[in-house]
């Protein structure tokens, strides 16, 4: 069977929804199947993602490859997004750069800094267990994360 044929699809599920549906232990079982050469990426998903989701620091989205009839489903990757604020001092950038950046944020006259809100793609990783990394490219995973950011922008507004 050609695993990347038109008989397959990707399913993205928020880790918080998985926890609600099958509990924390069930979610941990799914996450334990994830392996990655980058141990920081692997350890975040296995040991921090649940706590970060519960505390609303960030939201992790698991990406599964599935047959159309969903008889086969494999965890192929994940990405994590979070709200982020950057404070930029006028002294640290050129006047022209500051003028451009200030269009995206709010100037605080007391601190003399411009605060800009953004959405951070904090983690992104492919699952190398049992060759699952061949079921998705890094570009596809990044596009899913960027599309999620664009959807958030559409829902809440803001300029990113």
Predicted regions and their residues:
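Non-catalytic substrate-recognition and accessory regions of acyl/acetyltransferase enzymes
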Residues: 1-133, 140-160
């Amino acid at each position: 069977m050609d695993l990347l044929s038109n008989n397959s699809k990707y399913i993205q599920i928020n880790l918080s929804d998985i926890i609600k549906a099958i509990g924390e232990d069930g979610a941990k079982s799914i996450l334990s199947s994830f392996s990655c050469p980058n141990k920081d990426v692997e350890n975040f998903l296995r040991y921090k993602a649940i706590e970060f989701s519960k505390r609303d620091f960030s939201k992790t989205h698991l990406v599964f490859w599935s047959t159309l009839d969903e008889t086969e489903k494999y965890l192929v990757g994940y990405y994590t997004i979070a709200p982020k604020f950057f404070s930029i001092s006028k002294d640290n950038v050129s006047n022209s750069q500051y003028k451009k950046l200030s269009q995206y944020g709010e100037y605080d006259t007391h601190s003399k800094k411009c605060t800009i809100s953004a959405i951070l793609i904090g983690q992104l990783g492919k699952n190398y267990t049992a060759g699952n990394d061949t079921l998705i490219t890094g570009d596809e995973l990044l596009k899913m994360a960027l599309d999620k950011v664009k959807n958030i922008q559409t829902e809440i507004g803001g300029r990113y």
